């Protein structure tokens, strides 16, 4: 059983998946830093110094100066955090789109004329055609 697990774990696809997962986690941290440390301060500057991390609607109690205090006081809707995460998602989606597009350009497309069906399939089609004529 241990041998079977070792063969399963060392198969190419599983290793590729693990490497992709680790790279994805590192990429997520990088994108989060770009959004939080570069893009959101620029957006905040353009919007008159608005700190998106503290944008919220207080649903209960008196207004509070920070999101953390507002959450302690009662229900809140932190729409500023949502805006930040939405920008984060859009950047990740756009980068993945560009990566897939580049990969599709580099990957050779199979020539439809050179791909022939297996012999068994050809024989079965011939048998089907003969039976259909009878």
UniProtKB/Swiss-Prot annotation:
Organism listed in the record? Methylocella silvestris (strain DSM 15510 / CIP 108128 / LMG 27833 / NCIMB 13906 / BL2)
Report the gene name: mscL
NCBIfam families, per database record? mscL (TIGR00220), PRK00567.1-4 (NF001843), PRK13952.1 (NF010557)
Instruction: Please give the start and end residues of each transmembrane region.
Output: 15-35, 80-100
Q: Which family does it belong to?
A: Belongs to the MscL family.
What InterPro entries has UniProt attached to this entry?
MS_channel, MSC/AndL, MscL_channel
Q: How does it assemble?
A: Homopentamer.
Name listed for the protein in its UniProt record: Large-conductance mechanosensitive channel
Q: Which GO terms describe its molecular function?
A: mechanosensitive monoatomic ion channel activity
Membrane disposition = Multi-pass membrane protein
Q: Where in the cell is it found?
A: Cell inner membrane
Could you tell me what this protein does? Answer: Channel that opens in response to stretch forces in the membrane lipid bilayer. May participate in the regulation of osmotic pressure changes within the cell.
Question: Keywords, A to Z?
Answer: Cell inner membrane, Cell membrane, Ion channel, Ion transport, Membrane, Transmembrane, Transmembrane helix, Transport
* S-S bridge residues: none
- Is this entry keyworded Cell inner membrane? yes
Cellular component annotations (GO), alphabetically ordered = plasma membrane
Q: Which domain of life is it from?
A: Bacteria
Upper taxonomic classification of the species?
A: Bacteria, Pseudomonadati, Pseudomonadota, Alphaproteobacteria, Hyphomicrobiales
